Regions:
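Terminal alpha-helical segments
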Residues: 1-140
Length: 140
């Protein structure tokens, strides 16, 4: 499905730029990053920690969508938003990877390894920093 199809199906809609909502999303994203960074990663915590990192990234993507005048109702649509609206191919790839891992945890009870959570701990904050510095400086 491409971006236009998401719009046609109502999974993405035009929205007004709500600056307070963007600020709130950025604050929640940072809180999740801060909390996740303090947690020890082991086999029993790794899935929970990965989901926290994914949620922090998704909230930044939601803030970006709102800033660009969109309300997104599908996590998968963020993959296309990053790639086709922002031309962020690598960000799109990384987001999609963590989206799939998170879906495995949340919908299928599939655990992720401590190594995957450790990778998220280094990769996700780096990507969030890139997106914030490039697009969301005024909301930091």
């Amino acid at each position: 499905m491409d971006w236009d199809e998401y719009e046609e199906k109502g999974l993405v809609r035009k929205a007004f730029v709500d600056r307070e909502h963007i600020k709130s999303l950025m604050k929640m994203s940072q809180a999740k990053l801060d909390f996740a960074a303090k947690q020890a990663i082991d086999e029993s915590s790794s899935s929970i920690i990965l989901v926290l990192y994914y949620d922090a990234l998704r909230e930044v993507c939601e803030a970006l969508a709102i800033l660009n005048g969109f309300k997104v109702y599908s996590h998968e649509a963020f993959v296309h938003f990053l790639k086709y609206k922002l031309s962020e191919d690598e960000a799109s790839r990384i987001f999609n990877r963590y989206r799939r891992l998170r879906n495995g945890v949340n919908y299928y009870g599939k655990p992720v390894s401590a190594g995957e959570a450790a990778k998220a701990r280094s990769e996700v904050p780096e990507l969030i920093t890139h997106l914030k510095e490039k697009y969301l400086k005024e909301f930091n």
